[in-house]
Amino acid sequence: MPLCCLRVSCRTVRFRSKQLMLASQYVWAKEVPNPLEVNSGITYSCQIGDHADRSLRAALQLFAQIAQEPVFDQLRTKEQLGYIAQGYATASVGLMSYRFLVQSERDPVYVETRIEAVLDYLKTFIEELKDEEFEKHRQALIAKKEEKPKNLGEEGRRFWGAIGDRFYEFGKRKFCACSLTSSSYLDYHWK
């Protein structure tokens, strides 16, 4: 093998993820290179399960749809923790997570306590969610997943996204919509 090929293969970054043990907590703290920088950032990740579980993945996306407004409202609007304050569903090799991302001038330890308070609030929020509100969120997500690409560029981005994430699941939007429509799915994941 030519030397140039060896150099390229040595520099290739491999995607990896680590399935954490149940109820485990890990913190990776890194010092900011500039001591005058007042901003900090926190990524708080809650591992949900295996990315291959399509029904659970659809449930996670529905959770993310429902949680989007309350998370933003609490962290960004009410507590004003920072300009970037969001929660979203994400997948990586072998697992999927619900992740909070907050950039703030506040101490990351304090921000973490506020994220945990939002998680407690979300539990109550979802338990008290009226059937009509739940149905609006479910229908909105189904419509989003069934939406046809508006142009060739958008369709291409969807295909390249399936290639780029290395799952090669070109029909995952359709499967998510079908899963959300199924009543047995709703009975299993939400009752």
Which stretches of residues belong to each language-model region?
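Mature, solvent-exposed C-terminal subdomains and processed small-chain segments of exported/organellar
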Residues: M1-K191
